[in-house]
Amino acid sequence: MNYSDVLANARQCIGKYCKACPVCNGVACKNQIPGPGAKGVGDTAIRNYNKWADIRVNMDTLCENGTPDTHVELFGRSFKYPFFAGPVGAVNLHYSDTYTDMTYNDVLVRACAESGIAAFTGDGTNPDVMTMATKAIGNADGCGVPTIKPWNIDTIKEKMAQAKASGCFAVAMDVDAAGLPFLKNMTPPAGSKSVAELAEIVKLAERPFIVKGVMTVKGALKAKEAGAAAIVVSNHGGRVLDQCPATAEVLPEIAAALKGTGVKVLVDGGIRTGVDVFKALALGADGVLICRPFVTAVYGGGAEGVKCYIDKLAGELADTMQMCGAHSISEITADMVRAK
């Protein structure tokens, strides 16, 4: 199976909203919620993709020859590659009933673990979403990151208990999720969090806590103040606020603000290839999350589809490193890329 096969297979079963496009750039699905689309006019997801494309890589092969080492150390673990599958919940709502949250997470979490990376898992108004996600992580010996929505504190405590029982190595919260149209005025309630509220949640985790949905230096410093081990520079793929800047536009300043603090910086939004992963690392990220294409990979090929996509990313990353003179992840530097 190759990636073209994965896309072709996915188009047969992924549902009416996602088109399993050859290039997942947000154009065909904009303003499709339910579905994978972005909010409002839908141009934030498109901008995310386009801004990575605007960054070019600087080739330099006047260096020692060698096989690039793509390993990275994060959250007390060693990963084969510096990228992770992003969180998705309620797949039968946003895609199709070919998969339930249980079967989707079982495939994704296990396939990612077997390939040397980890999957972040989703949450939703239906409590079964988190239950199924944490069961899948438990079945994979804790190799996954449950991602909790910013509910009221009582609901967070319940879901945090499930997360910890899974043996996960870290817990995340997508703090921007209160902007999701399908969470507005729902029960349980979700909303923004103060630094004090976030600090209380961080303590509940009792393991590295990742704040997902940071788009400003100010927000990054608040997450640091609350005790976060890492942040994810993210606008939720354009799904929570229309007319946002792209993550590639704000990543460098946020990474610079957190440099030397010990807080790790991850980024998502429109990253589709191993070359994009390289660009993100060059701009200061410690790691990358990729979401929508992993959904396509599961629907298009199950565990084999996930492995196919991971291998594709890994090959592209290693090739770019080799052609730019970086023999390890730590050797990827800002001067290896240039903005248009």
Give residue ranges: language-model regions.
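Structural signal for hydrophobic packing residues in well-ordered secondary-structure cores
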Residues: 49-59, 112, 116, 164-167, ...
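Conserved active-site-proximal phosphate/metal-binding subdomains
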Residues: 1-27, 219, 238-261, 271-340
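Outer membrane beta-barrel
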Residues: 80-89
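An N-cap/entry alpha-helix motif that binds or orients negatively charged groups
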Residues: 2-80, 332
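Alpha/beta enzyme core
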Residues: 99, 109-110, 138-139, 151-267, ...
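A gly/proline- and charged-residue-enriched helix-loop-helix capping module
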Residues: 103-152
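N-terminal binding-site loop/beta-alpha segment at the start of enzyme catalytic domains
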Residues: 90-98
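Short glycine-enriched loops at secondary-structure junctions
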Residues: 90-91, 123-128, 176
